[in-house]
UniProtKB/Swiss-Prot annotation:
Protein task: Required for accurate and efficient protein synthesis under certain stress conditions. May act as a fidelity factor of the translation reaction, by catalyzing a one-codon backward translocation of tRNAs on improperly translocated ribosomes. Back-translocation proceeds from a post-translocation (POST) complex to a pre-translocation (PRE) complex, thus giving elongation factor G a second chance to translocate the tRNAs correctly. Binds to ribosomes in a GTP-dependent manner.
Protein origin, superkingdom: Bacteria
GO molecular function: GTP binding; GTPase activity; ribosome binding
Pfam families reported in the protein's UniProt record: EFG_C, GTP_EFTU, GTP_EFTU_D2, LepA_C
Residue ranges of domain tr-type G in the record: 7-189
Name recorded for this polypeptide: Elongation factor 4
Topology of the protein relative to the lipid bilayer: Peripheral membrane protein
Family: Belongs to the TRAFAC class translation factor GTPase superfamily. Classic translation factor GTPase family. LepA subfamily.
Organism: Synechococcus elongatus (strain ATCC 33912 / PCC 7942 / FACHB-805)
Chain's gene name: lepA
Length: 604
């Protein structure tokens, strides 16, 4: 690893919607530059997590350094910083964009611009990145590059006359992409003489070396053995190992302004090296940290409980370890009369929640019961105190509260024109407020709605996909809190309230949701030896009820003809036994019942 002049460094990332071929393109660039030998190559090289390969999405950020000899004969260093494309991980995208000077905008030549591409492009424009449009999958029969170029020009306002037509899968246009990175992406500014400032854009936990921090040097120089200080947390560490990612770790002695690398410094937890934090030297420290760091806040909460309560310590250890590599995950212990001991966890969104659950089950062999997700409500009490409530069972009673506010999001849906009616109908039933509708092209439309986050986190995404045969894509961003007519609905099974099934609903929809929920529970809870009443209640008022009939033995089977009083005696004896059993019996509630809230038909 020789010293490189700053003018020969290019830092870039790839922006794309899910499935537009970003990871495949990254693979081709690694191969073309000889960074990864053909025999070591596996698909989605930068997606290290097994789960990422399986779902075909990028979750954690990766980075790779490539040496490339351009056609002008000069040797360049290209740093690719891979970004996730999913809406939940937009905070990961924003910090990786901060580490770049340029971005490849990858758009599927048959699909066109999608919602998440747009959101990420706007982030890139905010960071003043040079954007190079690339039309991928050009060899597909449905590809229409001219239409997609027009779309990019109209929607984003980028000049597409020089857009590169490529196919990452068959390797078309890869050389052209590399050349345009060298010629169009500006080099980093040369600030080697300034005090050290480096931006952390990712970190992960290594069980042997502690936290490995991926960073980009913005100003100054960092050397192995330096004592560094993290400006947000104020903690100091000594660098044990310094290196670059090509894409495997290669140790170096020092890194200068503009370079991308990693540090191991015996850091105990990822929370100590927060992403977006600034690294500086302990002695000659910088006065100002780098701007734009925001701590990621969980938007969605749910309860996680082990099916076997003896494994509670294992779940705690697993969450601790996961939090080491996922700073956005929050958790705190929670107990529930129905489920025993568990944790209340906070996530960035639904996909993040699913991934954490799946990783807990897969990597730590845990069997989990999860409660339905809820969002954070703001409750103002009569004393004027503002409480943040992330668990419906913690909502103060009506006589103690002045108002409840819920988070609202701005939802942008890009859809083919013929599904607009179905989507407007869906948004209307989810308490959406229509804001705007724009035609991107003759066939594609953007719908903009404002709606409560609680309506989006349940199954809005699935409903949207099924109503548009999978063609629509969406993006949402938080716009603040608004007051609403919200009530807590409790579910009583056998006259006992079950905390994990409690939900906060809008008063107008309470009856429909309650009715649908008890009907769903009736299907899911198996019959017992005694009759089980199911009720949905707001306060002490029952708004919907169902009952699961008892399984009963035919006690009259032995009576042939004979006296009616004999039959009555046997039936009364059975009824007495059932009554006693009901008083002391417990109801087994299966896992599916707790997720029933998600799969309700909410269209009342």
């Amino acid at each position: 690893m020789t010293d490189v002049s700053v003018s020969k460094i290019r830092n870039f990332c790839i922006i794309a919607h899910i499935d537009h071929g970003k990871s495949t393109l990254a693979d081709r660039l690694l191969q073309e530059t000889g960074t990864v030998q053909a025999r070591e190559m596996k698909e989605q090289f930068l997606d290290n997590m097994e789960l990422e390969r399986e779902r075909g999405i990028t979750i954690k950020l990766q980075a790779a350094r490539m040496n490339y000899r351009a056609q002008d004969g000069e040797q360049y260093v290209l740093n690719l910083i891979d970004t996730p494309g999913h809406v939940d991980f937009s905070y990961e995208v924003s910090r990786s964009l901060q580490a770049c000077e340029g971005a490849l905008l990858v758009v599927d030549a048959s699909q066109g611009v999608e919602a998440q591409t747009l959101a990420n492009v706007y982030l890139a424009l905010e960071n003043d990145l040079e954007i190079i449009p690339v039309l991928n999958k050009i060899d597909l029969p449905g590809a229409d590059p001219e239409r997609v170029k027009r779309e990019i020009e109209e929607v984003i306002g980028l000049d597409c006359s020089g857009a590169i037509e490529a196919s990452a899968k068959s390797g078309i246009g890869i050389g052209e992409i590399l050349e345009s990175i060298v010629h169009l992406v500006p080099p980093p500014s040369d600030t080697t003489g300034e005090p050290l400032r480096a931006l952390i854009f990712d970190s992960y936990y290594d069980p042997y070396r502690g936290v490995i921090v991926y960073f980009r040097v913005i100003d100054g120089t960092v050397r192995k053995g330096d004592r560094i200080r993290l400006m947000a947390s104020g903690k100091e560490y000594e660098i044990d190992e310094l290196g670059v990612l090509s894409p495997n770790q290669v140790q170096v002695e020092e890194l200068h302004a503009g370079e991308v690398g990693y540090i191991a410094a015996s850091i105990k937890a990822v929370a100590d090296a927060r992403v977006g934090d600034t690294i500086t030297l302990a002695r000659a420290r910088a006065t100002e940290p780098l701007p734009g760091y925001v701590e990621a806040k969980p938007m969605v909460f749910c309860g996680l409980f082990p099916t076997d309560s003896d494994r509670y310590p294992d779940l705690r250890d697993a969450l601790e370890k996961l939090q080491l590599s996922d700073a956005a995950l929050q958790y705190e212990p929670e107990t529930s009369s129905a489920m025993g001991f568990g944790f209340r966890c906070g996530f960035l969104g639904l996909l993040h929640m699913e991934i954490v659950q799946e990783r807990l089950e897969r990597e730590y062999n845990l069997d989990l019961i999860t409660t339905a997700p809820s969002v954070v409500y703001q409750v103002t009490t009569l004393d004027g105190e503002v409480l943040r409530v992330d668990n419906p069972s913690k909502l103060p009673p009506p006589q103690q509260r002045e108002k409840i506010e819920e988070p609202y999001v701005k939802v942008e849906i890009i859809t083919p024109e013929n599904y607009v009616g179905a989507l407007m109908d869906l948004c209307q039933t989810r308490r959406g407020i229509f804001i705007d509708m724009k035609y991107l092209t003759q066939e594609r439309t953007t719908l903009i709605y404002e709606m409560p986050l609680a309506e989006v986190v349940t199954d809005f995404f699935d409903q949207m996909k099924s109503r548009t045969k999978g063609y629509a894509s969406m993006e949402y961003s938080l716009i603040g809190y608004r007051e609403g007519e919200l009530v807590r609905m409790d579910i009583l099974i056998n006259s006992e309230p079950v905390d994990p099934l409690a939900t906060i609903v809008h008063r107008d929809k309470a009856y429909y949701v309650g009715k649908a929920l008890v009907e769903k529970l009736k299907e899911l809870i198996p019959r017992h030896q005694f009759k089980i009443p199911l009720q949905a209640a707001i306060g002490s008022r029952v708004i919907a009820s169902e009952s699961i009939p008892a399984l009963r033995k035919d006690v009259l089977a032995k009576c042939y003809g004979g006296d009616i009083s004999r039959k009555k005696k046997l039936l009364q004896k059975q009824a007495k036994g059932k009554k006693r059993m009901k008083a002391i019996g417990t109801v087994d509630v299966p896992q599916e019942a707790f997720m029933a809230v998600l799969k309700l038909d909410r269209e009342g």
